[in-house]
Structures are given as structure tokens and as C-alpha cells.
């Protein structure tokens, strides 16, 4: 449920509960219900539907009664994501991680949910040879105990168990990485023939050198030097200007006269093995003394000679190698353009010592490219110790070392981690990785290796002497004794013992079992040997918490994830049930004496439910909430006498067993004078008036009755007792009675519903990051089905009106990129110009699902045997019933007439439709898919500029505005103008920048402001819109630029630099806020503009 309310007092509970549910309905409901104690009977009324619909159907107000209700790990833990990146659990915003299937011991991508909890005072540190993990005592790990893989709480570990760690990462990668070019000013070498040609053409045209300067800007003195040979070369731009003035074809002079430029540096478009090796070495031991020089150093001259050749291959640049002051050589590469290119594409190369990081794109690359990157790092900082039989690397950046450790796992190379504390003052600690087992040595040699010949010779020599001995990890978590018992026959390879086998021994056992014909036994052991995980010993200690919050994940299916290489158990994947009467709140116990409403998620509900079912409890729903009344019922059984005091204790004991986020309100028919509430990370507010007390998930629930409230805090349990002469209210936290400050709310109902924002429109604009997270996932199968229809049908129309039509215009551009013609059509004109038959697909976009013209277009299409689809926000609307395929947007209720969050939600759905269509064509759409999860953060960046936008809006003084853009953002210009005029009541017109010269530019002066929506810098129309801006400025027009880059002479609203395909989504909040703040400044009715309705249901 989206909101809950409880009441105890002298008034009729059903009336107050119904009113509270009505007030909370703006949050969105799919079902609702109430529970009331009347004459010691618990009466539950609930069903699927809107509040009024359910209240009427279930006859809420027929009930009497005066009491009722209406509906971890340390944050620095690194988790492995499916694309190979590692990310702190506290920073994860992805929806999948890698999880272990203990059936085949392999890793798979699984969906997750993340939870944050208050950290206890004491945590536990688990230390293995490979990593450390800091966690709460209640957190579970997968361990081996007595030869079996079991789940065990950290606080119960004794150190004799084995913990699972990752040995190899297998996942799909996407190396579709493209680098940006940087400007390189070319200088062309001129011979005497070209000099004379330029001079003769000038003279033939009758131009003096002074004339040339005036006409094209090339200085007279420069022309003298070129023609007389005092300058041996000429810059490309100046040569182009002269050619243009002289009427000479620039390309022709370059190729026919065989001109060569003197600085022929080249830049790669995509990663190559040679480039990745260079990048690895620079991060390891590179240095930029200036903005035009790079230095590498090494003890071995031949290594630098090899890297000099790599620079020649990749960049067409050669450096100089010289002897350094010590026992090393230096390779210097001098090129400003090379440094510019590195700074533009790989800024991580410029991190200071101690802050080294792997460029993020590296994690997306294929293994060949990653191997080259690692080779460069190990060339720079790696070493071999022949005596210790170890390959090692040490750096002062812990994060970078961890990244190397993760990347090595791609190849099955397991490296142990250690931290060396430096005794010297002001010296950073060193973080080291050591590779010491034979299997990892072999894989390192095969995939990575060293450039230095002597290092490779040492590696070979060590390998020749090594056996398959591994003392830091165990591949098969069975002792020798347990292995002999498992195979059931005598083995020559091993004798009974309580120790574990090395890989070398396991290989010998497998050979022996195969020779005996015990192939199934051999295959079972080989499965462990080839697994993605191994097992290791550990140490454990208690430590004081140094953080306020700890984190946990819910992982579907396998219920585990990788944290700091260690396999962690999770809070079970919560199934909260479908929309049905059984799953509606309130929920009751077996005897139907206790009723509970709940907001949030009980993350350990599955374990609790399993335990309760074993004890005979019968569940009626699929929800997590239902465990609460059953748990209270079970706790009550522990008391010989059931009285008020013991009931309260039972409730508190039950609450202690809950994990997750919750706001609970609880009643019991046997104790009609008690109302109990509990809060943990989900809002719950206590309302107070003379006739009773309220509990609500927000103030709106009871603001009609009182403005006095106490916001409860995490861990609070409130007990409200109704007595003959008044009420007794107790708030406890961790068993201690606490006082909470009462506040008087000055909001009216409208302000409360707006969550304190002055208008619904602003609230809905600010909700967009969260809304888009829903729109990014909803209706996945329906979108795939609609994409297939687009592929199968000859003609495709998107019909819509107003804001929805602008969204449809965006989709025209998206599908054009994939070679598919789709038509965005004004639904009111579709009957006049639509060409419709049984080979036609017509998709209606309508927020309400009730837009008259859009429904009329869909009905016209069906009448002519076309296939129909609808992209809709309101479930159960007319459009959902009439279309063949319905795609829900998931934007939630939008109250303001002016569409904001529903527009960006529509764009997200259409962007996903574009991606699915591309996949059907066999295109690689992975880069586009990755942008989906980034969009909410991009939107947040724009929303963070709201004060800047407000200031700009308040400085707009004219009554006429033009919104311009080009390409896909023409739709943004049209939508921006629509937003502006519909709530400011000022004239605003949106158009393509290309139309300015076709009449509109004559209107530009100091009384006409222009809002320019500037596309991303890599857009083909970026320079064109800049030209439009200059045209406006030249005529005295003021320019407001919504832009990813500063525009001189304009008032800039800076937005993130994104790919062009998602820019209409990212830019939208900027012009929405601009319109909003200007309308507020003018005193307009922002939420209900004059003459407009939320849904146009008439012609």
C-alpha cells in the first residue's frame, strides 16, 4: 500500500479511516481496506480498486467502532556487477549483480533490491588472504562446515569454517567504446611551386596583400612570409581562407599538388590492445610534466623501446629515450595534441599518486583488451620473486589495487591482498597483490605476461619447478577423509586425513577415478576444480562501527552476491503479491483477532513465514505484511495469561524479529482500547487532538482533524491506551521510554498533499528521477511485443495530442536512426490524412487513456482493420480496453494540468521501444541500454539547477518568446513553448532553428526573447543551432540557452552532456522549471491554468 492510517478515539473510526484513505489516494492505490473493532469483533473490509469504489462496494460506513486501521554490510563493501565493474554497496543504483548458483558453482546475473539500515555499535571484521569484509553480526555468509555448504550468521562463526570467495568472473562484455577526437592544427609544407601559384592567383585577381587581409583576415605580413619562403609551412585554416578567396579548390590543392602536413599525429577511434597496454603503463608509472609532454621510465631500455614502438603504431608518434639520473631510462613523448586527447578521453591518467583508478570503460572491454591493459600495469609496477615463487604488484591506491584484483579474476587469476603500513612519516600505506599458485601462474603467462624478457624467463623457470600446490585457498571443501568416504573405494593417491587436498592432488585423484571407471565421481570433483568459486580460511574479530548506516541486498533466485570477493547471503527476495483482494490490507492472524496495515518491505519475511508455517500458521496472501499478525499471534502463545500487558510485550517481541523498512499500525479485537504503531525507515506520524489519536504515513491522513503531530523516529514503538478519563501514550525506542517533540503543522490539506511543495506541478517535476526508475522497468513484455509489431507492419503511426504528440515526434527521429519510417500524427487530423489498412499499426499515446481525439483515431484504425497499441498512464482507462496491446507508463498520478513527469515517462517508454526494435534488427543496442539507468541521475543534475533557473525566469521581462532547436530536440522546443504559454499566459512559439530565416527572424528584437535548446556537442546539428543563436544576438535578441556547454552572450542553463537520443528526456525538466518559475512570478494558477483540463475528453 502507498499510505496507512490508524485511529483511536471517540469518533466513528470508519468515517475517519475513509477520509484518511481519500486524502492519501493522491499517492496512488490499486487496492485498499479498513479494519475496525466493533463490540469486540474485528471487522475487515477490503478489495481491489479506488478508495471510493471499494468503500461503496464494501460498505465501509456501515461499521461502528472507535478504533481502526487502514493500510547488512559496511557501505565501503565492493560488490561485483554483471558488466565486470565493482561498486560500493552504498553507491549501487543498478538492478542486477553477480550471484552464485550452488548447483553448478557458476556465476549468473540476478535482479536485486537494496536496503539501508542503522548500523549497530559493534561490527565484525572477516579477514581472508584475499580480502576483508566488515559486516553486522546478523549478516549471513555461505560457509563450509562439516563438508556441507550452509548459511551462517557472522556472529556465530568460530573460524573453523571455510568461506567462499570468487576465483573467476564469467560474464558478457560490451566493448562498444568510441573515443572523441580532439582538435589538431595541421601545418602544410609549401614548396616553391605552390608559393608562386598563390602569389600569381592573387595578382591575377588584382588583389594587394592588404586587400587579402581585409577580405579573409589573413595578415599581410603572414602572406609576405608565405610568398617569399620565410615560412616553410602554413596552418590549415589560413590555407583554407586563401583558397576560398582565390577560388582554388582546397581538397584539389592538397591531393593534386601532394601537400604533406608536418604534424601527422593520429588518434584511435576505439580501444586496441596496443592502446590499452599504453594506458596501463601510464597509470602504473607515467608522468605528465607539462601539457605537452609525457614521460615513462623503466630500468630496462628494451621495455621503453617496445613502448616507443607502440606509440608509433597507435598515434604515429615517436619519442626520445635517454638515461635518467639513477638506474633507469626515460621515454619522452612531446605532443600537446596527444596530451589533449588523453585528457579528453581518459582523464583518470591525470589522477594524483594514491588516487589511481581504472578508467570505467575498461570494465566493459573484452578479455583481450583487458589483458593488454593489465600487461601495461604489470610492466610498470609488477615484479617477480623467484625465491618466493610470486608475481607481485604494489601501489598506494587501495581502490586501484582492488580493481586490478577484480580484473585478474576475468582470467581465473587469484591474487591475495595485503596492506603494508609505512613507518615513515607522511608516507602512504602500500597495498599489494601476490599471485602464488600454479594455476594462476599459468594463466598469467598465457593471457598477460611481461614485456621484459628477463621477467618472462623468471616466470618460466618458476613454473617449471612448481607443482599444483595452493595453500591460500581450497578448491574442494572436503577433507581427504571425506573424499575417500565420498568415492567409496580405496585410493592410492591419498590416505585418510583431516587436511584438504591441493589442486595437484585433486587432479591425481580424478585421474585415478577415471582409470577405475568411476566417471561420475571424477566429474563431480572436476566440477569443483573448474568452479568459479574456491574456499578459504579466515580470521574474525569484533570492531567498533565507524558508519551510521549499513546496507543489504535482496537477490532473486540464488539469494547471494559477491561482496569484497566473499560470497554473502542476502535478505530474501521479497514477493509482495499481485493486485487482488487477498493481498489488500489489512492482514490478520489465523484467529482473525489481530489486524495490521504496513507501509514498506519486511525483508526477512520469507524466513519468518517458513518458520510460522512449520508451526501450523495458515497464510491467505502472498504479501510480506501478513507475517506480522501471525508473528504476534505466535509470540502471544509464550504467555500463560493473555492480558493487555503481555499482548503489548508480544507485539514488541514480534517487532524485534522484523528486518527491513516498515511503518506498522496494529489493532486487536480483544484489546479494543489499544492502538500500537512502529516505525523503521518508513514514515509514521502520530496525530493528536482532544477526541483521539491518529497514526498516519503522512500528515495528510489526519490533517482534517488536527494540526498537532509528532513525527516518530526509526526504532520507535508507540502504544496508545484509551482510558475512562483520557489517553495514555508511551513511545519507546530500544526498550527505553523517549520523549518526542510535538509540532504544529501550518500546512493546509493542499500543502500536505504536495509534500510541502507550493504546487503539485513543482512536486511532480521533482519526482521525475524516481518516476523514471519505474518507467525504465515497467511493461517489458508489452514493449517487446509492440516492437515486434513495428517490425512486422508496413506503415506505423503514433497518434497523439498536445504533450503526447511531442513525445511521438521524438520517436520519429529515434526510429529513423534504425531505418524505419514511423509517422507522428496529430490525432485530430488522422482521419483526414491517415492511410490505414490491415498492414498498418496505429499506436496511441495518451496519459489519461481518455483523450477524445486519440481514442477516435484508434477506433478509426480498428474499423479499417489496423493493429492498435496504446501507451497509457491510467490502468483501466478506455484506451487500455480498446487497444490490442497496452503499454503502461508507470508515472503515477499526475494532478497538475500541465504534463511534466508523464512527458518524460512517455519518452522513457519510447526510448525503450526504440532499443527493443533495434535488437530485433540484430543491432547492438547495449550502449543505449546502459544509458537507461543513468537517466535519473542526469535528471537530478538538472533539478539541482532549479535556483539558477528561477533567477533566469524572474529576469524574463518581455511578453513574447521563441523556442528553437534542431534535430530530435525540435520536439523539445515545441514542448518547451507549450509548457511556457499554457501556464504563464505569455505568447510562446516553438520551431526548428532552420525556420528562423523563413519569416520569424523579422520579429526578433529586444521585445522577443529566444530560448535555444542546444543539442549535445557531438550532434550533427550542434554548430547549426549555434549559428541560429548568433543570428538572434546580432538582431538584439536575448538568448536563454538550455545547453551542455557555455554559450557566450547567453543566459545559460547547463544540462549534462549526454547522447543525443536521450537528450529530450534530460532537457525536459529545465524548460519545465523555467515555465513554472515564470508563471509563479506572474502570480498564475500553476496547477490549474485557465481554460484547460487535465484530460480533453470532448472534441
Curated annotation (Swiss-Prot):
Cysteine-cysteine disulfides: none
Alphabetized InterPro entries for the sequence: Cro/C1-type_HTH, GATase_2_dom, GFAT, GFAT_N, GlmS/AgaS_SIS, GlmS/FrlB_SIS, Hint_dom_C, Hint_dom_N
Glutamine amidotransferase type-2 domain residues: 2-71, 571-723
Transmembrane segments: none
Active site annotation, chain numbering: 2, 1094
Primary location class: cytoplasm
Catalytic EC class: transferase
GO BP terms, alphabetized: fructose 6-phosphate metabolic process; intein-mediated protein splicing; protein N-linked glycosylation; UDP-N-acetylglucosamine metabolic process
GO cellular component: cytoplasm
Keyword Protein biosynthesis recorded: no
Pfam families associated with the record: GATase_7 (PF13537), HTH_3 (PF01381), Intein_splicing (PF14890), LAGLIDADG_3 (PF14528), SIS (PF01380)
Annotated SIS domain residues: 786-923, 948-1089
Domain of life: Archaea
Compartmental location: Cytoplasm
PTM field: This protein undergoes a protein self splicing that involves a post-translational excision of the intervening region (intein) followed by peptide ligation.
Family indicated by similarity: In the C-terminal section; belongs to the SIS family. GFAT subfamily.
Summary of subunit composition and partner proteins: Homodimer.
Protein name per UniProt: Glutamine--fructose-6-phosphate aminotransferase [isomerizing]
Amino acid at each position: 500500500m502507498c499510505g496507512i492510517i490508524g485511529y483511536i478515539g471517540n469518533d466513528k473510526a470508519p468515517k475517519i479511516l475513509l477520509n484518511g484513505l481519500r486524502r492519501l489516494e493522491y499517492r496512488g492505490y490499486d487496492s485498499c481496506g479498513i479494519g475496525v473493532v466493533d463490540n469486540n469483533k474485528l471487522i475487515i473490509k477490503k478489495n481491489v480498486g479506488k478508495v471510493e469504489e471499494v468503500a461503496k462496494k464494501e460498505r465501509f460506513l456501515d461499521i461502528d467502532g472507535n478504533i481502526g486501521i487502514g493500510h547488512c554490510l559496511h557501505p565501503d563493501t565492493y560488490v561485483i556487477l554483471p558488466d565486470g565493474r565493482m561498486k560500493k554497496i552504498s553507491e549501487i543504483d543498478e538492478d542486477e549483480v553477480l550471484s552464485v548458483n550452488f548447483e553448478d558453482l557458476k556465476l549468473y546475473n540476478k535482479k536485486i533490491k537494496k536496503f539501508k539500515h542503522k548500523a549497530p555499535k559493534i561490527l565484525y571484521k572477516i579477514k581472508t588472504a584475499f580480502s576483508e569484509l566488515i559486516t553486522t553480526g546478523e549478516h549471513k555468509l555461505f560457509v563450509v562446515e562439516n563438508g556441507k555448504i550452509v548459511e551462517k550468521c557472522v556472529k556465530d562463526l568460530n573460524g573453523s569454517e571455510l568461506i567462499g570467495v570468487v576465483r573467476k568472473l564469467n560474464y558478457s562484455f560490451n566493448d562498444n567504446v568510441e573515443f572523441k577526437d580532439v582538435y589538431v592544427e595541421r601545418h602544410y609544407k609549401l614548396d616553391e611551386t605552390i608559393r608562386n601559384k598563390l602569389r600569381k592567383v592573387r595578382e591575377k585577381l588584382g588583389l594587394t596583400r592588404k586587400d587579402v587581409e581585409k577580405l579573409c583576415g589573413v595578415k599581410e605580413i603572414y602572406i609576405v612570409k608565405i610568398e617569399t619562403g620565410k615560412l616553410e609551412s602554413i596552418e590549415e585554416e589560413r590555407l583554407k581562407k586563401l583558397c576560398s578567396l582565390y577560388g582554388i579548390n582546397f581538397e584539389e590543392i592538397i591531393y593534386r599538388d601532394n601537400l604533406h602536413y608536418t604534424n601527422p599525429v593520429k588518434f584511435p577511434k576505439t580501444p586496441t590492445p596496443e592502446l590499452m597496454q599504453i594506458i596501463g603503463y601510464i597509470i602504473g608509472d607515467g608522468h605528465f610534466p607539462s601539457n605537452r609532454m609525457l614521460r615513462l621510465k623503466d630500468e630496462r631500455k628494451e621495455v621503453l623501446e617496445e613502448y616507443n614502438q607502440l606509440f608509433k603504431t597507435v598515434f604515429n608518434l615517436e619519442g626520445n629515450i635517454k638515461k635518467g639520473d639513477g638506474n633507469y631510462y626515460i621515454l619522452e613523448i612531446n605532443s600537446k595534441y596527444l596530451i589533449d586527447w588523453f585528457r579528453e578521453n581518459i582523464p583518470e591518467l591525470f589522477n594524483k599518486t594514491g588516487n589511481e583508478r581504472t578508467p570505467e570503460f575498461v570494465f566493459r572491454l573484452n578479455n583481450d583488451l583487458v589483458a593488454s591493459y593489465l600487461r601495461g600495469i604489470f610492466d610498470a609496477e609488477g615484479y617477480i620473486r623467484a625465491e618466493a615463487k610470486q608475481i607481485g604488484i604494489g601501489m598506494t591506491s587501495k581502490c586501484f589495487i582492488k580493481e586490478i584484483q577484480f580484473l585478474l579474476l576475468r582470467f581465473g587469476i587469484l591474487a591475495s591482498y595485503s596492506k603494508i603500513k609505512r613507518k615513515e612519516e607522511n608516507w602512504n600505506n602500500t597495498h599489494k597483490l601476490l599471485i602464488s599458485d600454479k594455476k594462476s601462474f599459468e594463466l598469467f603467462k598465457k593471457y598477460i605476461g611481461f614485456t621484459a624478457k628477463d621477467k618472462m624467463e623468471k616466470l618460466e623457470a618458476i613454473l617449471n619447478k612448481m607443482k599444483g600446490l595452493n595453500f591460500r585457498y581450497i578448491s574442494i571443501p572436503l577433507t581427504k577423509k571425506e573424499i575417500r568416504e565420498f568415492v567409496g573405494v580405496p585410493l592410492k593417491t591419498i590416505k585418510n586425513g583431516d587436511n584438504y587436498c591441493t589442486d595437484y592432488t585433486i587432479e591425481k585423484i580424478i585421474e585415478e577415478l577415471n582409470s577405475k571407471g568411476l566417471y561420475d565421481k571424477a566429474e563431480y570433483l572436476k566440477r569443483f576444480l573448474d568452479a568459479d568459486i574456491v574456499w578459504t580460511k579466515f580470521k574474525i574479530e569484533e570492531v567498533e562501527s565507524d558508519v551510521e548506516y549499513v546496507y543489504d541486498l535482496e537477490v532473486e533466485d540464488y539469494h547471494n552476491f559477491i561482496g569484497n570477493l566473499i560470497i554473502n547471503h542476502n535478505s530474501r527476495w521479497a514477493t509482495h503479491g499481485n493486485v487482488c483482494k487477498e493481498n489488500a490490507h489489512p492482514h490478520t492472524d489465523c484467529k482473525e483477532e489481530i489486524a495490521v496495515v504496513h507501509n514498506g518491505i519486511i525483508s526477512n519475511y520469507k524466513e519468518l513465514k517458513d518458520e510460522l508455517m512449520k508451526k501450523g500458521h495458515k497464510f491467505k496472501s502472498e504479501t510480506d505484511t501478513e507475517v506480522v499478525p501471525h508473528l504476534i499471534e505466535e509470540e502471544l502463545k509464550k504467555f500463560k495469561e493473555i492480558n493487555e500487558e503481555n499482548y503489548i510485550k508480544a507485539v514488541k517481541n514480534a517487532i524485534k524479529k522484523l528486518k527491513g523498512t516498515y511503518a506498522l499500525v496494529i489493532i486487536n479485537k480483544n484489546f479494543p482500547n489499544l492502538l500500537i504503531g512502529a516505525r523503521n525507515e518508513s514514515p509514521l506520524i502520530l496525530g493528536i487532538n482532544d477526541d483521539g489519536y491518529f497514526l498516519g504515513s503522512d500528515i495528510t491522513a489526519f490533517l482534517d482533524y488536527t494540526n498537532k503531530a509528532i513525527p516518530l523516529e526509526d526504532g520507535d514503538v508507540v502504544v496508545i491506551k484509551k482510558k475512562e478519563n483520557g489517553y495514555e501514550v508511551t513511545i519507546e525506542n530500544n526498550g527505553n521510554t523517549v520523549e518526542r517533540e510535538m509540532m504544529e503543522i501550518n500546512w493546509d490539506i493542499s500543502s500536505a498533499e504536495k509534500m510541502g511543495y507550493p504546487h503539485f506541478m513543482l512536486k511532480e517535476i521533482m519526482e521525475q528521477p524516481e518516476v523514471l526508475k519505474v518507467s525504465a522497468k515497467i511493461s517489458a513484455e508489452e514493449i517487446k511485443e509492440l516492437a515486434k509489431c513495428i517490425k512486422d507492419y508496413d506503415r506505423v503511426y503514433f497518434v497523439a495530442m498536445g504533450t503526447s504528440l511531442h513525445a511521438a515526434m521524438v520517436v520519429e527521429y529515434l526510429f529513423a536512426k534504425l531505418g524505419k519510417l514511423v509517422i507522428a500524427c496529430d490525432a485530430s487530423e488522422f482521419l483526414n490524412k491517415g492511410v490505414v489498412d490491415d498492414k498498418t499499426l496505429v499506436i496511441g499515446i495518451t496519459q489519461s487513456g481518455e483523450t477524445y481525439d486519440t481514442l477516435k483515431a484508434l477506433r478509426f484504425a480498428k474499423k479499417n482493420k489496423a493493429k492498435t497499441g496504446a501507451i497509457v498512464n491510467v490502468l483501466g482507462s478506455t484506451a487500455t480496453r480498446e487497444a490490442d496491446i497496452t503499454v503502461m507508463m508507470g508515472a503515477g498520478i499526475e494532478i497538475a494540468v500541465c504534463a511534466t513527469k508523464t512527458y518524460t515517462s512517455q519518452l522513457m517508454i519510447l526510448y525503450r521501444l526504440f532499443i527493443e526494435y533495434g535488437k530485433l534488427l540484430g543491432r547492438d543496442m547495449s550502449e543505449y541500454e546502459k544509458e537507461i539507468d543513468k537517466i535519473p541521475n542526469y535528471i537530478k543534475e538538472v533539478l539541482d539547477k532549479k535556483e539558477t533557473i528561477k533567477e533566469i525566469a524572474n529576469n524574463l521581462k518581455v511578453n513574447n518568446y521563441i523556442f528553437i532547436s534542431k534535430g530530435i530536440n525540435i520536439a523539445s522546443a515545441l514542448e518547451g513553448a507549450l509548457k511556457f504559454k499554457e501556464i504563464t499566459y505569455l505568447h510562446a512559439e516553438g520551431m526548428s532553428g532552420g525556420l528562423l530565416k523563413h519569416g520569424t527572424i523579422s520579429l526578433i528584437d529586444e521585445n522577443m526573447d529566444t530560448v535555444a535548446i542546444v543539442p549535445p556537442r557531438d550532434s550533427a546539428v550542434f554548430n547549426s543551432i549555434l549559428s541560429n543563436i548568433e543570428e538572434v544576438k546580432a538582431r538584439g535578441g536575448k538568448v536563454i540557452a538550455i545547453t551542455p556547454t557555455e554559450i557566450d552572450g547567453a543566459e545559460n542553463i547547463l544540462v549534462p552532456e549526454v547522447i543525443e537520443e536521450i537528450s529530450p528526456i534530460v532537457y525536459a525538466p529545465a524548460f519545465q522549471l523555467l515555465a513554472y518559475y515564470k508563471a509563479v512570478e506572474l502570480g498564475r494558477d500553476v496547477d490549474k491554468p485557465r481554460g484547460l483540463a487535465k484530460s480533453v475528453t470532448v472534441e
